[in-house]
Amino acid sequence: MAGILFIISAPSGSGKSTLVSELRKQVSGVEFAISWTTRPPRGSEENGREYNFTSREEFQRMLDTNVFLEHAEVFGNFYGTARKSLEEARSAGHDLLLDIDVQGASQVRARMPEAVSIFVMPPNPRVLRTRLRNRSRAEGVVNEEEVYRRLNEASKEIENYREYGYILVNDILDRAVAQLEAIVLAERYYRNGEVIAYRSRRVLEVAAACLQFNSQERLKPVLEAFGILGSTSQQQLDFGEDSDREDPAQDGEDPNDD
């Protein structure tokens, strides 16, 4: 049985890493490609677990020797996925999940148009701002300049949502995890005929509702909030008031999520 290549992308702070972590607990046979990066570890991150941390010089050497399937520069740091991850997953007949940004996703889709692409959106700028501030606080200092830079970049990234096959809005963690799981199981069913038992109809319905072309009405308030639809401009985005409250919908969110 051939493995499926899944791509998942999201603006920084959208909770993507948490979704991936929960998916791997609930669905077997999904390999996770650990990216290489030149950024320093955050918090409790460990080399070889969340990322393979390396120097800019070593990253450039790997780039020069064609090690990477895709690579990108994000917020001044380099990220890349090694080709070896895909080769090993294919050899084992496993699915492979790439947690990569919109630049890297575009590169992979150009080479492998059969890949299943998933984009994760935060519900609105206020929630994203809270998440980014909480992460900054977890690192020991609230850098408002960095928070706003990432908020503005998020709007630009969300503009690329039409390039993805599936769209998730990560407003309620359990629901978003269930949707991600349904997408993986539905793709296995359609591509490989994998049996999903008594849950089959419900799983297929949940996945179908997340297809980009079925999501326009569901996404409309999110796109309007980020100034992508309607009259709201980038300069008019409402990022909310200062708040020390945690985002109640994301108790399990990983503060290290890129």
Question: What are the roles of these predicted feature ranges?
Answer:
Residues S35-L96, V102-S106:
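ATP-dependent small-molecule kinase phosphotransfer cores
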Residues R39-S44, R90-D95, Q107-R162, Y166, ...:
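A glycine- and Lys/Arg-enriched "phosphate-lid" helix/loop adjacent to the NTP-binding pocket
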Residues S17:
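Walker A/P-loop
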Residues K156-D258:
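NTP-dependent small-molecule kinase module
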Residues S9-P11:
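P-loop (Walker A) phosphate-binding loop of NTP-binding proteins
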Residues K25-A33:
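Post-Walker A helix-loop "phosphate-sensing" segment adjacent to the P-loop in P-loop NTPases
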Residues S14:
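ATP-binding Walker
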